[in-house]
């Protein structure tokens, strides 16, 4: 059997699978989990694939991209996604994580897929809310948006960010869809003075790019090497990965230079 991943509207990848382990459907999402000899378990959430053996790559990158550029990380907001492993990484900073996800049926169906599902859900520093309005009013050190936000959402989330806070969002991969990345950078640039694209170096199974945005905190100039060295139990993230994530080939530098703010 095969499953197909849409990388772009014109590019697809196929993966051999052995069996379907789970099929759960809600009003807004479809989650299927498959067994694969090559990649362990593979989750297909709508059109996106998650590889259980490689979950740590994105969660480590996004958590520590924010955590290692901020002196203090006390309050974090995660929206528009299901990745509880991201919260697990953020707990290394003794931070409080607000996690907004309305689809509890799908979230709970990841119980055997996310290695730290129970540890995160039962952590005293974790708050799960169905809607953002259910949370206490506060300002955040870091906001992670796990889907590409439109300008309206960027504006709303920015209002909850501390003056030196960091906003990280998912975007299209700049090599695969540079026009989409241009537009995402342009939208973010209307609200922040630092706006820089990055990717996950050496991650071969992803079609995602990301954007790091802030009013004051720079992802390279404000990098705190001592915090990186102090991290324990990480398998992907280090200082070299952090810096390499922002490296762009010459042609992309030319294409995106009008929209990058560094």
Curated annotation (Swiss-Prot):
The active site is at residue 155. InterPro entries: PABS (IPR030374), SAM-dependent_MTases_sf (IPR029063), Spermi_synthase (IPR001045), Spermidine_synt_N (IPR035246), Spermidine_synt_N_sf (IPR037163). The keyword Cytoplasm applies. Pfam families: Spermine_synt_N, Spermine_synth. It is an enzyme of class 2 (transferase). Homodimer or homotetramer. Belongs to the spermidine/spermine synthase family. HAMAP family: Spermidine_synth. This is Polyamine aminopropyltransferase. It comes from Helicobacter acinonychis (strain Sheeba). The lineage of its organism: Bacteria, Pseudomonadati, Campylobacterota, Epsilonproteobacteria, Campylobacterales.
């Amino acid at each position: 059997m095969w499953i197909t991943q849409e990388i772009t509207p014109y590019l697809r990848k196929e993966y051999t699978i052995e069996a379907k382990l789970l099929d759960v459907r809600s009003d807004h999402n479809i989650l299927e989990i498959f067994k694969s000899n090559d990649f362990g378990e593979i989750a297909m959430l709508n059109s996106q694939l998650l590889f259980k053996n490689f979950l740590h790559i994105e969660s480590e990158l996004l958590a520590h991209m924010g955590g290692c550029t901020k002196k203090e990380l006390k309050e974090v907001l995660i929206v528009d996604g299901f990745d509880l492993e991201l919260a697990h990484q953020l707990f290394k900073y003794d931070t409080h994580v607000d996690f907004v996800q309305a689809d509890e049926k799908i979230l709970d169906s990841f119980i055997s897929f996310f290695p730290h599902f129970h540890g995160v859900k039962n952590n005293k520093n974790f708050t799960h809310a169905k809607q953002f309005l259910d949370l206490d009013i506060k300002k955040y050190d870091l906001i992670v948006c796990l889907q590409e936000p439109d300008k309206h959402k960027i504006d709303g989330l920015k209002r909850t960010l501390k003056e030196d806070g960091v906003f990280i969002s998912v975007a299209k991969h700049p090599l695969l869809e540079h026009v989409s990345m241009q537009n995402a950078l342009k939208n973010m640039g209307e609200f922040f003075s630092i706006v820089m694209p990055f990717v996950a170096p050496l991650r071969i199974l992803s079609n995602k790019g990301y954007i790091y945005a802030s009013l004051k905190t720079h992802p390279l100039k404000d990098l705190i090497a001592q915090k990186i060295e102090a991290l324990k139990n990480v398998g992907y993230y280090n200082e070299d990965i952090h810096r390499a994530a922002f490296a762009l080939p010459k042609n992309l530098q030319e294409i995106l230079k009008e929209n990058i703010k560094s």
